[in-house]
């Protein structure tokens, strides 16, 4: 007798781009919506309550559209959560308010001038909410009849569609039949047809047809049959940035440049025409300007010409809120021989509202490391977390969060369920923090190649061919 054949169904789950970054655990600013009071630890942010309260006040004014053309500087030592606060603001703004994030070094390019890169960043941070009314046919498909010609000519058909109150038959042409076939529309589907563009949107399947099949796919969505008239007027809102409008109007390839990224230099005449047109739409009530947020990290890397441009751009009618971060104290302004606080020119510093960040306490470092471990799905023993907290205090928070991952890899090698103190100690010995690296360089300085390319070979352990 033949042995029974057993089959095992295998399914591969498609994973998206779900990488864990340095600030992927941040979900918002962690403040109370009504009072704007920061919670001690919420939405991935811990501590820095004064800075978070200041950021929440700015955020509230952005949402209400009461503030634009202002500059805010988040200043503080390294590893005090400056970028984290900016990421929290981006998460709290929502999808409609534009938020552009760039590092100061990104604007230096051989293909594009510095002022053009800054202009594009400013324009990306200003949104235009365009309202348009369109006539839509919305209802449940009762029947689709398609008459195909024997000679392969034009197809013709009839669509019977209904709501709970009425039923109508529409004649369909070739393009509409092709769209129906592409969307796989069948009797019992709830669809929406835009009369101006002919776009068909499949909203779901009618509850009345829920018993048509015994088995349904996970993507099948059941909705109620629409009520009232078949043809309704709906207001559709599109939110685009000024930069996107610039690109579409500046090149022969139009919107394709948005996907390729090859926008190049955009002429100022094009931008002026768009500004005039947007102002007309605003007066007619067709559009609404949404001033967004431009965040420039490591702002001390900008040079004096960039600061001069930002000075002027902040005074323009269409200007976003510019939030900057710097970890410098008294530093030289790039392009000059002058020293200035935070590396910013004094005339620009006068226009800036400064928010300061402080060093984290031991308890706050412990909470942040626990959140990071939870985000990376790593189990830490209490002793390991205590040791990491001590390392974070003595070295810096970034180094402590980095060796969480390496300690986890070491614990996996010995098939442990959680990271122990021994794993953290081994990682600490394997990977140097900045302080120990500097100590090592100072100790063996003569063996390293210097600025002039010199190296002292006599400082080595001796020649292998030396005869005593």
From Swiss-Prot:
Location(s) in or outside the cell: Nucleus
Catalytic reaction annotation: ATP + H2O = ADP + phosphate + H(+)
GO biological process: box C/D snoRNP assembly; chromatin remodeling; DNA repair; regulation of transcription by RNA polymerase II; rRNA processing
Keywords per UniProt: Activator, ATP-binding, Chromatin regulator, DNA damage, DNA repair, Helicase, Hydrolase, Nucleotide-binding, Nucleus, rRNA processing, Transcription, Transcription regulation
EC number(s) given by UniProt: 3.6.4.12
Pfam families, per database record: TIP49 (PF06068), TIP49_C (PF17856)
Record flagged with keyword rRNA processing: yes
Primary location: nucleus
Enzyme class label: hydrolase
Binding-site positions, ATP: 76-83
Cellular component terms (Gene Ontology): Ino80 complex; NuA4 histone acetyltransferase complex; R2TP complex; Swr1 complex
GO molecular function terms listed in the Swiss-Prot or TrEMBL record: 3'-5' DNA helicase activity; 5'-3' DNA helicase activity; ATP binding; ATP hydrolysis activity; DNA helicase activity
Free-text function comment from the UniProt entry: DNA helicase which participates in several chromatin remodeling complexes, including the SWR1 and the INO80 complexes. The SWR1 complex mediates the ATP-dependent exchange of histone H2A for the H2A variant HZT1 leading to transcriptional regulation of selected genes by chromatin remodeling. The INO80 complex remodels chromatin by shifting nucleosomes and is involved in DNA repair. Also involved in pre-rRNA processing.
Family: Belongs to the RuvB family.
Assembly with partners or alone: May form heterododecamers with RVB1. Component of the SWR1 chromatin remodeling complex, the INO80 chromatin remodeling complex, and of the R2TP complex.
PANTHER family: RUVB-RELATED REPTIN AND PONTIN
Name used for this protein in its record: RuvB-like helicase 2
């Amino acid at each position: 007798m033949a042995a029974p054949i057993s089959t095992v169904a295998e399914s591969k789950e498609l994973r998206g781009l779900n990488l864990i970054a340095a600030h992927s655990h941040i979900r918002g600013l962690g403040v109370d919506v009504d009072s704007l009071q920061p919670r001690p630890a919420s939405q991935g942010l811990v501590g820095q309550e004064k800075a978070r309260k200041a950021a929440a006040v700015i955020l509230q004014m952005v949402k209400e559209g009461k503030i634009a053309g202002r500059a805010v500087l988040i200043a503080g030592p390294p590893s005090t959560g400056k970028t984290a606060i900016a990421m929290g603001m981006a998460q709290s703004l929502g999808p409609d308010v534009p938020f552009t994030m760039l590092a100061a070094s990104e604007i230096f390019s051989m293909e594009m001038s510095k002022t053009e890169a800054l202009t594009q960043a400013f324009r990306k941070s200003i949104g235009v909410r365009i309202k348009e009314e369109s006539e839509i046919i919305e209802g449940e498909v009762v029947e689709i009849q398609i008459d195909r010609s024997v000679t392969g000519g034009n197809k013709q058909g009839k669509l019977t569609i209904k709501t709970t109150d009425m039923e109508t038959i529409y004649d369909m042409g070739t393009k509409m039949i092709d769209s129906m076939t592409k969307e796989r529309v069948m009797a019992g589907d709830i669809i929406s047809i835009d009369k101006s563009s002919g776009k068909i949107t499949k909203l779901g399947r009618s509850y009345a047809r829920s018993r048509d099949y015994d088995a349904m796919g996970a993507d099948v969505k059941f909705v109620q049959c629409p009520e009232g008239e078949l043809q309704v007027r709906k207001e559709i809102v599109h939110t685009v940035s000024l930069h996107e409008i610039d690109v579409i109007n500046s090149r022969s390839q139009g919107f394709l440049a948005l996907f390729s990224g090859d926008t190049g230099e955009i002429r100022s005449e094009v931008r002026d025409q768009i500004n005039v047109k947007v102002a007309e739409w605003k007066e007619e009530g067709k559009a609404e300007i949404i001033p967004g947020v431009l965040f420039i990290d490591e702002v001390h890397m900008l040079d004096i010409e960039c600061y001069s441009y930002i000075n002027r751009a902040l005074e323009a009618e269409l200007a976003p809120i510019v939030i900057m971060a710097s970890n410098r104290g008294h530093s030289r302004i790039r392009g000059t021989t002058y020293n200035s606080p935070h590396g910013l020119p004094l005339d620009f510093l006068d226009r800036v509202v400064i928010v300061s960040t402080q060093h984290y306490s031991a308890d706050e470092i412990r909470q942040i490391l626990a959140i990071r471990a939870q985000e990376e799905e790593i189990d830490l023993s209490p002793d390991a977390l205590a040791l990491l907290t001590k390392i974070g205090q003595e070295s810096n928070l970034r180094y402590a969060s980095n060796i969480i991952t390496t300690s986890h890899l070491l614990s996996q090698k010995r098939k442990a369920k959680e990271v122990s103190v021994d794993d953290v100690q081994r990682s600490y010995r394997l990977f140097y923090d900045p302080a120990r690296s500097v100590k090592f360089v100072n100790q063996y300085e003569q063996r390293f190649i210097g600025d002039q390319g010199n190296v002292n070979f006599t400082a080595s352990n001796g020649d292998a061919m030396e005869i005593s």
